[in-house]
């Protein structure tokens, strides 16, 4: 059963306690919902700054009793208190600055959230909960523009004869844009804390995630944004046209 706020989880009970940073965002909310449905105690850590966080939290509270901690990943003391007080068995680190365009406008904020914020969490785990597992949500941007991969333009899409099923995760890293650099730095710190300090960490390099509860915008979550724009065009003849960058043949995994 789902444990109420404040109850402790027996270390060997088999019921795992999960901490999700960015827990009220698109990815975090969907993951939290699945864990709550399976009876796990879940702690959500979010600064509630992004559009959609409040309705996502309301949805989650209709599914169970998540423990909610409002705070900022940039606040090292708050993150340390979070880990020390909640003692999670596993952490999904999903909090972050998610738009490349925002990183270009505000590179310092982007770095402090994505890179420094991740180190704050790693240090908190190292000091207070080294046995916990950490899964980090990275990005395909760490691979850069893939300049060495030849692309062939077809009628409806681009293809890569040398990589028909996409590039492998051992593709050399090539950080580009402030966003790629901040996420790439965090990506490598997560792996290095496993090598240097023995933390249990893993990195997922996601690309073009979309789905329910996303609240997509033009510069982040573009599949959802395109779908919404297309529906609005259909529902409102004469609505302003929307812009597709490039030729529309780009392919993501």
Q: Predicted regions: what is each one?
A:
Residues 2-5, 22, 37, 71, ...:
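C-terminal substrate-binding subdomain of Rossmann-fold SDR/epimerase-dehydratase oxidoreductases
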Residues 2-209, 214:
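N-terminal Rossmann-like NAD(P)+-binding domain of SDR-like oxidoreductases, especially those catalyzing
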Residues 61, 224-227:
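Intrinsic disorder/low-complexity segments enriched in polar/charged and small flexible residues
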Residues 148, 184, 197, 209-225, ...:
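Glycine/proline-rich active-site loop of Rossmann-fold NAD(P)-dependent oxidoreductases
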Residues 193, 226-229:
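A short, amphipathic alpha-helix embedded in the catalytic core of nucleotide-handling enzymes
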């Amino acid at each position: 059963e789902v444990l109420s706020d404040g109850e402790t989880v027996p270390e060997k009970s088999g019921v795992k306690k999960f901490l999700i940073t960015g827990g009220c965002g698109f990815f975090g909310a969907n993951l939290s919902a699945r864990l709550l449905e399976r009876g796990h105690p879940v702690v959500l850590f979010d600064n509630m700054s992004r559009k959609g966080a409040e309705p996502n939290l309301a949805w989650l509270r209709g599914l169970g009793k998540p423990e909610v901690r409002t705070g900022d990943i940039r606040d090292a003391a708050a993150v340390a208190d979070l880990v020390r007080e909640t003692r999670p068995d596993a952490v999904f680190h999903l909090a972050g600055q998610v738009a490349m365009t925002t990183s270009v406008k505000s590179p310092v904020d982007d770095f402090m959230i994505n890179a420094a914020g991740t180190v704050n969490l790693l240090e908190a785990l190292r000091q207070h909960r080294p046995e916990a597992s950490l899964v980090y949500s990275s990005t395909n941007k760490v691979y850069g523009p893939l300049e060495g991969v030849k692309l062939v333009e077809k009628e409806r899409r681009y293809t890569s004869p040398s990589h028909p099923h996409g590039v492998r995760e051992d593709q050399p890293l090539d950080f580009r844009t402030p966003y790629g650099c901040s996420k790439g730095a965090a990506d490598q710190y997560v792996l290095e804390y496993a090598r240097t300090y023995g933390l249990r960490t893993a990195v997922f390099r996601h690309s073009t995630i979309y789905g329910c509860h996303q609240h997509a915008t033009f510069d982040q979550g573009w599949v959802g944004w395109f779908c919404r724009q297309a529906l609005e065009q259909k529902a409102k003849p004469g609505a302003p046209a929307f812009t597709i960058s490039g030729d529309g043949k780009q392919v993501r995994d």
